[in-house]
């Protein structure tokens, strides 16, 4: 609670409450439109799979969702860093875990909260659920009960049972240690390791490190009472006893003398600079206490510039984050129907993650983390959490280990086919907003000008931007009006870190007026007209700030129509050379991540304009790390209608052909991407339908749709945004010489923040 200020707390509550409360819902995977569908789904048709399963229990994987279903189960006795909150209060966390399973590995997960602190009662409640799920993820159960619960359930159930608080941390830690040892020319068996904190994660770390080859006699485990040594009686249990050291050392300070490795799973401030200074040459320091590490990387580097450092935090390099493990470990285990997650599978996961860090980083990952050096070395020993390769690399390694160790039920297994399946299961663009956030966090923050700074949603978005450290917000408005609006949002909210600019009181009015007059003097504007615009029109003033270098990006639109806002800004900021102003939206769905353009500007584009929009949108896709497959959309497909309205679309394809064949640039952009048209949306997105047109040039489903006109583009994107469950981002403005985003008048604070994130990234590219 201390780490969450009032606005974040309120925003979090609103996020969980709005629309349908919570974060997960059940959706159907089969059609339920007709009476026949209903008869097949339930009575009498459902009897058929029931009878087949009764004959052969393995058929449950064939006819039900069990093969892709995980239960996230807790009793709430160790909720995050909040302690014993109880079963009901743990539910938001368990729902969040279920969301991560779906987002990162396409695993359906459901949360179950068991209202008991008695380990035996908990075990009895869970053990009978085996036929319902393909795996069990235990979460937020306090030690030492968590050890007993996991051990017993693993012995009673024939599906994977995995306590992520233990093993997830252990696996990512092991991956980092494998690479850190390699970089410092050490072997695992020779490492002298000190671990501070003797809870679930620490015990699991020791188990896995020993399995990897670390010498047990060279590990010293400490807790709040000091070294866990043989003969100690205070604060002991059988799990600590297992790793009690035969040593005369009694304190953490003594333990760190000449130690090679420190693994912290304890509390902030547990380690001092003096302790670190006495470690061995090239020390390996994993300070993973959350939210604040045992010692900060800055303090470590102050005394040991030869150290390799990892933490649990995303704002430092080498983040030990469980999300790199558990979704993909379960993915691999489920896909081969493993009966357990054994040590061999955990080792395989750790080694796969370690190996991935040594590989060249693909362009889409590098772009997402712009400004960060991602070459295997001291600052990059662990992959970044949003590396889309993780699902293929880790899940495959786990699946193979399950088969080789004899715990997999699936015997007919092709590694190559499995990798292809995993690659198509999740598209990298599904995590694009996270990529943007990481890119922003790796460079100096940009100044983002919010023209309509007196509006509640705009102020809320600016506050979120400040708190998330996405940028330095500048809001245009009158202080007294802003303060009134701020009180509506919540009391005791500070605007610290947000700059307020009142256009009428600015000391830059003369400079901005001079700039604007030079642009408009031959367009019917007198100097006094320009002075009035700068002083009274918030869009003009904000645009002048960006044009004159006093801001890096501009957001506006919630108080004016898109076209009115566009007309204001175009007076101040021109289109980029060889670019047209256009709008696009991104639809992020399970099977398709699609860019739709132009849904903002050109009402009825001619053939050349369509070709230009296609080329520019393909460039946008490339900048997002997407290989563009462009479809020029119509109601007809490849000439099956001779109506005149489709001719311009075919002509646009011919224009693209000519530029592609002659290797010429269209508006300064190479036509070196896949494209075709005219075609219907169904053909563009449906592989089976495209088979009817074997000449179609698209190698896969289109991921860029160029709409034939503004009406169809705007209507289709608004319908998708309103009625589908797909994630939807936009409209996003592209083509100005400076970063400008024009918002919908209905934009919420979260939607404004999303678009502002694009503005931040665009501003980074301006440098």
UniProtKB/Swiss-Prot annotation:
A Pfam family matched in the record: malic
Necessary cofactors: Mg(2+); Mn(2+)
InterPro entries referenced in this protein's UniProt entry, alphabetically: Aminoacid_DH-like_N_sf, Malate_Decarboxylase, Malic_enzyme_CS, Malic_N_dom, Malic_N_dom_sf, Malic_NAD-bd, Malic_NAD-bd_bact_type, ME_PTA
The protein's Enzyme Commission number: 1.1.1.40
Positions annotated to bind a divalent metal cation: 139-140, 165
Record's keyword terms, sorted: Metal-binding, Multifunctional enzyme, NADP, Oxidoreductase
Cofactor note: Divalent metal cations. Prefers magnesium or manganese.
Active site, renumbered: 42, 97
Family matches, as SMART domains: malic (SM01274), Malic_M (SM00919)
A biological process term (GO) from this entry: malate metabolic process
Region (Phosphate acetyltransferase) location: 431-767
Membrane spanning residue stretches: none
Annotated positions binding NADP(+): 198-201, 290, 322
Gene Ontology MF: a single term: oxaloacetate decarboxylase activity
Keyword Cytoplasm tagged: no
Catalytic activity: (S)-malate + NADP(+) = pyruvate + CO2 + NADPH; oxaloacetate + H(+) = pyruvate + CO2
Region described as Malic enzyme: spans on this chain: 1-430
SUPFAM superfamilies referenced in this protein's UniProt entry, alphabetically: Aminoacid dehydrogenase-like, N-terminal domain (SSF53223), Isocitrate/Isopropylmalate dehydrogenase-like (SSF53659), NAD(P)-binding Rossmann-fold domains (SSF51735)
Family (UniProt): In the N-terminal section; belongs to the malic enzymes family. In the C-terminal section; belongs to the phosphate acetyltransferase and butyryltransferase family.
Designated name of the protein: Probable NADP-dependent malic enzyme
Organism: Rickettsia prowazekii (strain Madrid E)
